[in-house]
Amino acid sequence: SSIIFPLITFPYVSRILLPEGVGKVSLATSVVSYFSLIAQLGIPTYGIRVSAKVRDNKEELVSCTQELLIINIIMSVISYIGYFSMVFLIDKLANEKCLYIVMSTTILLNSIGIEWLYKGLEQYTYITIRSIAFKILALIALFLFVHQRSDYVLYGAISVLAASLSNVLNFINARKYIFQRSYRKLQFRR
């Protein structure tokens, strides 16, 4: 799905938004990607390993998931501070504030996404179905709403939703791993 959908969307988007609109969204995506990477702090890779290791111990799994989620949210707040400082201080970025604010939701949605938990628990069918469903919805939204050169912010929002809305579903679906009460203290050092 990561290869097929761009093959369908790119010709349409480049014809409608032209190089200028596509370039604005690509620059915003690149900037957000760096801050999202900082916010994630390697947690996805570590989270897969830890959740796979403790998946048979429910209490340990709940604790590890909570600890990693808290760390991820704290790092996202720090990353947001740096991101918005940069957006408002650099004129080229400040001129496109709306686009950069819309694109910044990627940082938040990635922090609550906890896809690493599902990979650690080897729930690949869920991951695949969810990912394809949201990409199809985004494809439909793209063809319905992006019709003019000025729709580049809307295109940015749709691309964020295509990539990150599944993280909201992950968070809602993971309530059995996050919102259970753990009877041991959280340990942020492991």
Locate each region found by the language model.
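Residue-level recognition of transmembrane alpha-helices
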Residues: 26-29, 68, 72, 103, ...
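Transmembrane-helix boundary and interhelical linker motifs in polytopic inner-membrane proteins
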Residues: 17-21, 35-70, 120-125
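Membrane-interface junctions at transmembrane-helix termini in multi-pass inner-membrane proteins
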Residues: 53, 107-129
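Interhelical loop/hinge segments that connect adjacent transmembrane helices in multipass membrane
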Residues: 125, 152-159, 168-190
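Signature of the first transmembrane helix
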Residues: 1-44, 84, 139, 163
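Alpha-helical transmembrane segments of multi-pass membrane transporters
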Residues: 4-11, 79-84, 129-152, 169-170
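N-terminal membrane topogenesis motif
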Residues: 1-5, 59, 66, 188-190
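Alpha-helical transmembrane segments of multi-pass membrane proteins
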Residues: 34, 77, 84-88, 92-117, ...
